[in-house]
């Protein structure tokens, strides 16, 4: 097997075993060691909790005021009927919700096939039993189906309902995921001389509203879209911050008073409009000696003070004075 030791193997879809119309086993290999569990667990969590689908959210049954009751002529109590309604597998085409109706009379089972609905609604499990009638009794109900994602308990929706919610409208815990069961297994795989690789086998059962293969494809798409944000991190470059050096030595921006010259020397400099040390160092000895009342003694004092600070007379400063000082002058 050729390639860099740091290069990751790219898995391929090896086999799709269609166990039944709603169950399939999907095998992918080879995976780098440890990636079987990494990808298997991520896909499993998405398939169970993040896949969009349709579920029953509300039910109204004629003659029933609350879920903790029973209905004459029906074998099951209301809680059991609600539990059975949660098992309906519904497909909505081009809409996010629909109202279904069910009316049945006479002894026998009541199934999903007895539900009346529009043409853009499909029930994938028409043989699903909702309840059983005894004797010459009947049952009528209205069932609301909505599109959603994940699991939404009835208690969470009840908090958002208005206080004037009609008596008899029963809220149902909604599990929107079309995946009924998902399990994965990691087995050993081999490629040429490498025997430390993984094989991922995903065993999944859906409620019939989506093919198992399509469910895995959608879950992988969701995972890839979420990881896109991390991929983009490699393109974000932090600009290198260059240390900005000051245009002039800070000491040149200080006033000449900081030199602590004698009063005579300081007054002579101020008379010549020499306010900053940067102004002073640009003057030559000849220029300073032409200053009224500034003799050789004062000149020597100025030269010694500047020398103690690493400065001297006759220096050339480009772009002097800086804008910050020019505004003050």
Curated annotation (Swiss-Prot):
EC number: 2.7.7.6
Catalysed reactions listed for this entry: RNA(n) + a ribonucleoside 5'-triphosphate = RNA(n+1) + diphosphate
GO molecular function: DNA binding; DNA-directed RNA polymerase activity; protein dimerization activity
Enzyme type, top EC level: transferase
Statement: the UniProt record of this protein carries the keyword Transferase: yes
Residue numbers spanned by region Alpha C-terminal domain (alpha-CTD): 248-329
UniProt KW Plastid keyword: no
GO cellular component annotations of the record: cytoplasm; DNA-directed RNA polymerase complex
One BP annotation, GO: DNA-templated transcription
Record region (Alpha N-terminal domain (alpha-NTD)): 1-234
The record's note on its domains: The N-terminal domain is essential for RNAP assembly and basal transcription, whereas the C-terminal domain is involved in interaction with transcriptional regulators and with upstream promoter elements.
Annotated function: DNA-dependent RNA polymerase catalyzes the transcription of DNA into RNA using the four ribonucleoside triphosphates as substrates.
Self-association and partners: Homodimer. The RNAP catalytic core consists of 2 alpha, 1 beta, 1 beta' and 1 omega subunit. When a sigma factor is associated with the core the holoenzyme is formed, which can initiate transcription.
HAMAP family in alphabetical order: RNApol_bact_RpoA (MF_00059)
Name assigned to this protein: DNA-directed RNA polymerase subunit alpha
Organism listed in the record: Shewanella amazonensis (strain ATCC BAA-1098 / SB2B)
Gene, per the UniProt record: rpoA
């Amino acid at each position: 097997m050729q390639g860099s030791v740091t290069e990751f193997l790219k898995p391929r879809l090896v086999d799709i075993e269609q166990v039944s119309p709603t169950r399939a086993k999907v095998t992918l290999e080879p995976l780098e060691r440890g990636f079987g569990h990494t990808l298997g667990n991520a896909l499993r969590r998405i398939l169970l909790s993040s896949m969009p689908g349709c579920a029953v959210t509300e039910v109204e049954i004629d003659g029933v005021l609350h879920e903790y009751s029973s209905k004459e002529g029906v074998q099951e109590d209301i809680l059991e009927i609600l539990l059975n309604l949660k098992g309906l597998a519904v497909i909505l085409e081009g809409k996010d919700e629909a109202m279904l109706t069910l009316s049945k009379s006479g002894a026998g089972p009541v199934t999903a096939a007895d539900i009346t609905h529009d043409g853009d609604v499909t029930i994938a499990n028409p043989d699903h039993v909702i309840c059983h009638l005894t004797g010459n009794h009947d049952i009528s109900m209205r069932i609301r189906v909505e599109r959603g994602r994940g699991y939404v308990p009835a208690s969470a929706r009840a908090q958002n309902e208005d206080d004037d919610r009609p008596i008899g409208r029963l809220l149902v815990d909604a599990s929107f995921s079309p995946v009924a069961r998902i399990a994965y297994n990691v087995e050993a795989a081999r490629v040429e001389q490498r025997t430390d690789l993984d094989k991922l086998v995903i065993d999944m059962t859906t409620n019939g509203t989506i093919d198992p293969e399509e469910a895995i494809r959608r879950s992988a798409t969701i995972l890839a879209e979420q990881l896109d944000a991390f991929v983009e991190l490699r393109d974000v470059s932090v600009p290198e911050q260059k240390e900005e050096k000051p245009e002039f030595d800070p000491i040149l921006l200080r006033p000449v008073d900081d030199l602590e010259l004698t009063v005579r020397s300081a007054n002579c400099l101020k008379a010549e409009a020499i306010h900053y040390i940067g102004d002073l160092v640009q003057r030559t000895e000849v220029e300073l000696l032409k200053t009224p009342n500034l003799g050789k003694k004062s000149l020597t004092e100025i030269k010694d003070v500047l020398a103690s600070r690493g400065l001297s007379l006759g220096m050339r400063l480009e772009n002097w004075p800086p804008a910050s000082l020019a505004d003050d002058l």
